[in-house]
């Protein structure tokens, strides 16, 4: 395995971990990095399996709370209602993701210009919502009305357009619906668990034939890097957005989108 390839795997794993749970589009960053670095040979298999590192990261950080919810589920109505809310929010993306899988993966994911455009547009929207979102009505993620869970789930469907961001679409939707900034990020974590796990399982089912023993080393490096980076982000993001909001992420999206556009137009 070439040293340069290991270095690329490490970089892309860190990139996946750091960007998966913040509203900047991990897919957009990974695809643009792969496009400009020429990291195409293990593309799909690598991208699928490093996502597992990010999934396990959020599960490990919230393991105690998830275990408590599991114990309470049979006899605690509030816990059952919260789990129902997560399921309601998850279903729209699950249904559309399966129905439109081929279009999403073969058409939209092959368009760097679209990715850059969505990074920029999403950055502008995030800046606007961060500045002008209405006064928070909901601060406890377990107490949203069921209609709010559904609407956040519908917003999440926008993330199927590469460059939009899964966490970004859910956070923007939550803020527009009156959810507190911290709670918006926290609910995005919980919604990520079934959404990312489902996407990972379906992607793996569709592409398992691409996995080879030769890829294991590079995938292992990317997986570990993604896990460590994602743990750091999940542990720190809630306090960060409570103090600073989301403006920094909006400006970052615009910067990367413009940089990507220049690269696409100049380098192709």
From Swiss-Prot:
Its main location: membrane. HAMAP family: Undec_diphosphatase (MF_01006). It is found in: Cell inner membrane. This is Undecaprenyl-diphosphatase. It comes from Chelativorans sp. (strain BNC1). It is an enzyme of class 3 (hydrolase). The gene is uppP. It comes from the Bacteria. It catalyses: di-trans,octa-cis-undecaprenyl diphosphate + H2O = di-trans,octa-cis-undecaprenyl phosphate + phosphate + H(+). GO terms for cellular component: plasma membrane.
């Amino acid at each position: 395995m070439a040293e340069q390839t290991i270095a690329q795997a490490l970089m892309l794993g860190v990139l996946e971990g750091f960007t998966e749970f913040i509203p900047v589009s991990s897919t957009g960053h990974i695809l643009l990095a792969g496009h400009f670095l020429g990291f195409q040979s293990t593309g799909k298999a690598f991208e699928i399996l490093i996502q597992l590192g990010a999934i396990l990261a959020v599960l490990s950080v919230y393991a105690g709370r998830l275990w408590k919810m599991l114990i309470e589920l049979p006899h605690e109505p509030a816990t059952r209602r919260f789990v129902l809310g997560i399921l309601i929010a998850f279903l729209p993306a699950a249904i559309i993701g399966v129905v439109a899988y081929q279009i999403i993966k073969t058409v939209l994911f092959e368009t760097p210009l679209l990715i850059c455009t969505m990074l920029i547009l999403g950055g502008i929207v995030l800046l606007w919502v961060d500045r002008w979102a209405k006064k928070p009505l909901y601060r406890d993620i377990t107490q949203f009305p069921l209609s709010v869970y559904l609407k956040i789930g519908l917003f999440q469907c926008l993330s199927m357009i590469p460059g939009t961001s899964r966490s970004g679409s859910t956070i923007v939707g939550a803020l527009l619906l009156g959810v507190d900034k911290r709670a918006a990020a926290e609910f995005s974590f919980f919604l990520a668990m079934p959404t990312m796990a489902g996407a990972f399982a379906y992607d793996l089912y569709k592409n398992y034939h691409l996995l080879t023993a030769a890829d294991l080393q590079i995938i292992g490096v990317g997986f570990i890097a993604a896990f460590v980076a994602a743990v750091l982000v999940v542990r720190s993001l809630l306090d960060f957005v409570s103090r600073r909001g989301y403006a920094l992420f909006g400006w970052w999206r615009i910067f990367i989108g413009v940089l990507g556009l220049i690269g696409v137009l100049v380098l192709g």
